[in-house]
């Protein structure tokens, strides 16, 4: 289970060092085989391969005649990239994916349960600012009655 956020730096080759606290779990659960893809929020999603496979299968099962579904399939599946974590716990983020998410040197890796989100640090700060400005009427019905 991945949770919490960590400020990291991409190296000059676009490699991201996965925090040590997650490396053993990733090597044990997927042998370091990871899928990185685009998210509509202009961040990147990072999945262990076994977690990604049913998601990709589900996305492919939707009717592709719907323009909205086809567009989402193109974005998520069309940008999916298989990467392997090296012995130092690094993964290479491709140039097209870095460009899509606007990633600069300083990034934030945010645990989201079974996956991570990778954000440019400035965009992450804006996202968090937005998340803290909800008014009572802005809460989606799915979250009504939910308490932390």
From Swiss-Prot:
Start and end residues of each SpoVT-AbrB domain: 5-51, 80-123
Pfam families: MraZ (PF02381)
Molecular-function GO term, any one: DNA-binding transcription factor activity
UniProt keywords, alphabetically: Cytoplasm, DNA-binding, Repeat, Transcription, Transcription regulation
Gene Ontology BP terms: negative regulation of DNA-templated transcription initiation
Keyword field contains RNA-binding: no
SUPFAM superfamilies noted in UniProt: AbrB/MazE/MraZ-like
Gene Ontology, cellular component aspect: cytoplasm; nucleoid
Gene3D superfamilies: Transcriptional regulator MraZ domain
Transcription listed as a keyword: yes
SS bond list: none
Subcellular localization: Cytoplasm, Nucleoid
Subunit relationships: Forms oligomers.
NCBIfam families named in the record: division/cell wall cluster transcriptional repressor MraZ
Homology family: Belongs to the MraZ family.
Protein name: Transcriptional regulator MraZ
Organism, scientific name: Nitrosomonas europaea (strain ATCC 19718 / CIP 103999 / KCTC 2705 / NBRC 14298)
Gene behind this protein: mraZ
